[in-house]
């Protein structure tokens, strides 16, 4: 009998691929992690722990955060996981509400422009120096400098002006927006605070003497980093929530999935993220393991390049030819590991609705009829996807089969993730459609960079859908939540009516953990970072 626990995520995330200036501050998607099927085996030497002793938790990760890890520019999964070990944000804006860290409360001015936060007065940096509002002002102002390439730049700098950050007193800080917005709490969240007394003279946040000798307010201190091998952390005795009971945590870098799984089964590592297919092959009880499933608020999708597939009715016909549930079952075994979204929002969003939305449920006869009406026959399409991603590879094969049923030939053009992403940016790229996925923020406005006609990440390259832009504008300027829900219901329907975007899956992450590690539920499994607060982890006595 396999041991399996299902958790509800307490966070829907915010990380960025790059800094970009947009008119309304939509967030950018977190970089996809396509390394689970990697074939390169990293140096398997450990931080002389190999699960040695009861005081170490070893987590196998599939990528190297590198020595450039820092609060300002880091935006990849394992880099952000490292940042969260060392530093703390004011708060995290979760699907279930705010989870406070360095701040304790906030108030809003009568004109809805200024947000004032009270800070904890009992926090020390890991070097013993006191944490104050000066550190908060320093961090946010550094994030607002375009030359710093901060991942949160577009959350704080707008065409209308820059968010003004001011110290009220040592433990109070205010943020004044240049316009009224219901997304302010979202835009200010998830930004980790760095110490002014350490970084005040730094001009290059990626290359300096402090990143690998970091001083933070998080639960752990980074004490050793070996490129391509491991990162070792020690408990921060000054942590404001109390010194963590797990004294050492090691991020063991193992790029090859088979190597990592074998290490997990042998007790050499304590945790590893796995796919449903990988979990299915394990005897969890025999290996003393538990699998935890949790949502990341991720949406996997198919997009059309509208510069190549220009006819909206042809795009819709192709969507009616597809069966997303067959794709999902092929990749994730059963709906225990996923839900099906029918709009651009993840299903756990409070704004998600299927009312008035065209779902494009498979109807082969309708697809054939629509193609015939459009005068299309012998259509050939090129599908771009990440070839090392097992899920996308399975989806691509089924799309090829399903479209063949309506007389459409699909060329599978799998490639490197970075190369595919770079090609998608080019409006004149050679792909007719592409598979992808994103993790965005809580608020629907954070998706604007993906779906507005001139959005920085609108790789569908459509134009003329003015209603979409208008509805995004209405949503971001409306403070009443019920009115916003009505607006975003219309917006979800409008995006699906383009026939350019086909949401396929909102899949769970699976973390498999050795049963000697306790407190996983208390630590909270969340998107990207894995744990909301590693200080809650414990090791069985």
Which stretches of residues belong to each language-model region?
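N-terminal lobe/hinge region of extracytoplasmic solute-binding protein
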Residues: 60-110, 141, 215
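Ligand-site clamp/hinge motif
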Residues: 236-282
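Surface-exposed binding/hinge segments that line
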Residues: 107, 111, 154-199
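Extracytoplasmic/peripheral linker and loop segments enriched in polar/acidic and small residues
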Residues: 411-420, 447-515, 540-541
């Amino acid at each position: 009998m396999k041991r399996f626990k299902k958790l509800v995520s307490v966070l829907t995330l915010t990380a960025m691929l790059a800094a970009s200036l947009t008119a309304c501050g939509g967030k950018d998607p977190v970089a996809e992690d396509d390394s689970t099927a990697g074939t390169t085996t990293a140096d398997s030497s450990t931080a002389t722990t190999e699960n040695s002793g009861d005081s170490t938790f070893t987590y196998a990760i599939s990528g190297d955060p590198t020595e450039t890890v820092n609060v300002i520019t880091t935006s990849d999964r394992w880099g952000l996981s490292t940042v969260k070990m060392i530093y703390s944000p004011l708060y995290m804006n979760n699907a279930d509400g705010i989870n406070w860290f360095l701040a304790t409360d906030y108030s809003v001015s009568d004109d809805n422009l200024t947000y004032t936060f009270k800070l904890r007065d009992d926090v020390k940096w890991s070097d013993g120096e006191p944490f104050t509002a000066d550190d908060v002002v320093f961090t946010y102002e550094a994030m607002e400098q375009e030359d710093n390439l901060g991942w949160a730049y577009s959350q704080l700098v707008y065409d209308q002006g820059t968010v003004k950050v001011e110290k009220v007193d040592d433990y109070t800080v205010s943020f004044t927006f240049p316009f009224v917005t219901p997304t302010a709490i979202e835009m200010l969240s998830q930004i980790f605070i760095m110490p002014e007394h350490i970084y005040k003279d730094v001009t290059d946040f990626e290359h300096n003497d402090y990143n690998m000798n970091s001083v933070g307010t998080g639960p752990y201190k980074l004490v050793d980093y070996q490129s391509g091998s491991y990162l070792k952390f020690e408990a921060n005795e000054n942590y404001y929530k109390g010194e963590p009971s797990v004294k050492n945590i090691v991020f063991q870098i193992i790029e090859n999935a088979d190597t990592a799984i074998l290490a997990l089964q042998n007790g050499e590592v304590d945790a590893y993220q796995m796919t449903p297919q990988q979990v299915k092959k394990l005897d969890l009880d025999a290996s003393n393991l538990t699998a935890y499933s949790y949502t990341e608020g991720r949406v996997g999708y198919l997009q059309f390049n509208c510069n190549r597939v220009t006819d909206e009715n042809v795009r819709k016909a192709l969507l009616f030819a597809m069966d997303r549930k067959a794709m999902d079952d092929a990749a994730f075994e059963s709906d225990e590991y996923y839900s099906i979204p029918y709009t651009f929002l993840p299903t756990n969003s409070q704004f998600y609705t299927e009312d008035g939305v065209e779902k494009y449920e498979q109807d082969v006869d309708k697809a054939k009829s629509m193609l015939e009406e459009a005068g299309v026959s012998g259509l050939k399409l090129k599908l771009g996807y990440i070839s090392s991603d097992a899920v996308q590879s399975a989806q691509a094969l089924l799309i090829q089969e399903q479209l063949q049923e309506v007389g459409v030939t699909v060329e599978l053009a799998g490639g490197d993730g970075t190369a595919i992403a770079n090609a998608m940016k080019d409006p004149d790229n050679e792909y007719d459609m592409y598979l992808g996925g994103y993790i965005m923020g809580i608020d629907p406005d954070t998706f604007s960079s993906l779906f507005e006609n001139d959005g920085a990440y609108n790789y569908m390259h459509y134009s003329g859908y003015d209603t979409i832009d208008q509805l995004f504008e209405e949503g971001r300027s409306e403070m009443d939540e019920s009115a916003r829900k009505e607006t975003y219901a219309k917006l979800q329907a409008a995006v699906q009516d383009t026939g350019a975007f086909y949401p396929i899956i909102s899949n769970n992450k699976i973390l498999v953990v050795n049963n000697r590690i306790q407190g996983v539920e208390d630590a909270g499994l969340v998107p990207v970072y894995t744990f909301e607060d590693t200080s809650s982890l414990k090791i069985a006595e």
